[in-house]
Amino acid sequence: NVTWKNSAFWVQIYDQCENLNIDRITVDSKAFWNNDGIDIVDCNGVKLTNSFFDATDDAICLKSHDPKSICQNIEVSNCVARSSASGIKFGTASRGGFRNIKMTNIKVYDTYRSAIAIQAVDGGLVENITIDSLHSYNTANVIFLRIGERYEGEKAKLNNVTISNVYAEVPAGKPDAGYEYEGPVEDLPRNISPASITGLPGQYVTNVTLKNITIVYPGGGNPNYAKVGTDAKSLNAIPEMPKAYPEFSQFKELPAWGFYIRHAKGITFDNVTLTAEKPDYRPAIVLDDVHGGDLENVTINDPGKKKNEIVVFQSTDIKK
């Protein structure tokens, strides 16, 4: 029952703590750009429950600053998050990594970037992540899973992620319009970005299950504004960007409106529904360098009615 309001930087940071319980807190901090709502860094055994976050920067953020440590055994439940960055974020600092993280019953709204961003970009291990019961409204992106290599030679791993029971609505306009510190308009030109799971060549995101997922997109992708096709030349031209700061929009225009998956193994879609409210020139899903994928239980509602809504390129063992 504690309220924090308008910090000058990160509102609160818990660094290398053990057996920490945080319950019924309120964060209302929109005074400056770097107002993370809460940062849990290289901790072991944290429970964050029944709390509300309205923050300019990432609302609920897990970090790992120490390559010899790890952020693990974290439970977050019954929380509401609003941000001009991401609602729930693993990273960007991910030196040691994240393990055994469970998040349940989370609502994200009016959020400029991602509802869920899981980033392994600094050489750490990210594994055994469970996200269950997520409701996301007026948020620019729903799911962003990313392997990067910001420190050359430090290979990260992202393995065993389950995201289930999600309902999300992606708006056509800017989700945080009208807030005092809005997220910066960047990575243009691009139409509405899809959810994405992206590794690197030889560094695969592995074993991801998406179950009972419904995402409603505005559609309306206009090829005269920005266009990436699904031919080999166009798909191969999408940059890898291993050292770039990871954001769902970093690739600019992507060739799918629903999901873009590249450099991944063991991807399962189980009862996933993707809806575009207006015709979009792009297919719903593009798989590139994906090996082992089950997309048989996918429903696509596209007023454009394309013959091929799931494009498979340079991939093997894909069921659709």
Regions found by a protein language model. Give the residues of each.
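Extracellular/periplasmic carbohydrate-active domains that bind, remodel
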Residues: N1-K320
